UniProtKB/Swiss-Prot annotation:
Alphabetized Gene3D superfamilies for the sequence: Aspartate Aminotransferase, domain 1, Type I PLP-dependent aspartate aminotransferase-like (Major domain)
Protein name as catalogued: Glutamate-1-semialdehyde 2,1-aminomutase
Pfam families per record: Aminotran_3 (PF00202)
Quaternary context: Homodimer.
Main localization, broad class: cytoplasm
EC number of this enzyme: 5.4.3.8
Residues found modified as N6-(pyridoxal phosphate)lysine: K267
Cofactor(s) needed by this chain: pyridoxal 5'-phosphate
Record gene name: hemL
Subcellular localization, as worded in the UniProt entry: Cytoplasm
GO biological process, one term: protoporphyrinogen IX biosynthetic process
Transmembrane regions listed in the UniProt entry: none
Taxonomic lineage of the native organism: Bacteria, Pseudomonadati, Thermomicrobiota, Thermomicrobia, Thermomicrobiales
UniProt cross-references to NCBIfam families, sorted A to Z: hemL, PRK00062.1
Amino acid sequence: MMMENSGSLWDAARQFFPGGVNSPVRAFRAVGEEPVVAVRGEGAYLIDADGRRFLDYICSWGALLAGHAHPHVVDRLSEAIQRGTSFGLLSPYEVELARAIVASVPAIELVRFVNSGTEATMSAIRLARAVTGRNLVVKFAGCYHGHVDGLLVAAGSGVLTFGLPGTPGVTEGTARDTLVLPYNDQEAVEDAFAQHGERIAAVIVEPVAGNMGVVPPAAGFLSRLRELTRQAGALLIFDEVITGFRLGLGGAQERFGILPDLTCLGKVIGGGLPVGAYGGRRDLMEQVAPNGPVYQAGTLAGNPLSMVAGLATLELAREPGVYGRLETLAAWLQRGLEETIQESGLPAHVQRVGSMLTLFFSQQPVTDAQTAERCDTARFAAFHRAMRAQGILLPPSQFEAWFVSLAHREEDIDRTIEAARKALAEVARG
């Protein structure tokens, strides 16, 4: 196949895909740029169709804990593909990955693999409604749980990036079954349970919000959710599609010491291949077909290639010192960015949990969707363009997380800090 350049590929893509892309944020519209057309990844670097190398902090939106094309993952995949690409039957590879997940994630006793994070949250919500006999689901403004109809109401990620209140096509009936509250607002949650507690099937939450930028939970917020759901007989669902195996082997629930009833996973557990999973207490998961009446199925669920890539990634994650190294590199990056912000005189903040972080152009820290929406998107766009011009690839939205991978090195962090110093100075000059 003759390789076209980025410009011609972008022209062709617009002929075939809505907006030229298969996921909206990839269009780079929020930063006023043409998209990066990726053809290859090597460690912490991504190479576009014109041969330009970018130091990558998108990392496939957090899926690439080990970086691009890690030799261990590639070797395992090369072996696996010789055995077949899909069976549609039980295989040892899904058993091995499930064993690793159950051994690592405190709240998961049984797990079901699906093909995406969206499928995971959709299936968890269905299960919660079935076992409680209730319809109402509580979510938080700015938290994104995939493109499930009922969870797109006041969502984060691309919905927030493009300034959309929700999306057409979601019926009023579906929206009525979703109660949207401010993230980190314990009082609002308490009021909701006081008024609607008997109708609430579940509360679904990103334990660390990653889709309005990185927003950590306020002290006591997650524990209060746990108390209120338990008292009301509702389920607590942690959407750990981003944080699962990103913040540690046990994810956010281990980091904060709060155990949900159900957990949704994705991204890292597929090692860069399509995957999702939901799991939780045995008594709940036993209600999923074929053991129970809650139906859910998928032709490619437990796909052997995804399972092998995920298991290879988790093998790397279990090596001694891995999460300590990620923490050290990300903290180093945060400190360097904060120093450059201070030098620039710009109103900006860096928020980080583990190896995920965001630089917000804001007068105050971001604690919820409302404060996220006050951020200066024009300044972020200028910053993004200046960083890209220096070969640093950031998410093309202020409301997406940056990710540090195992492939990033100290010299990469230093290079990023120096590039940010120049970019922020350029933004400050206007």
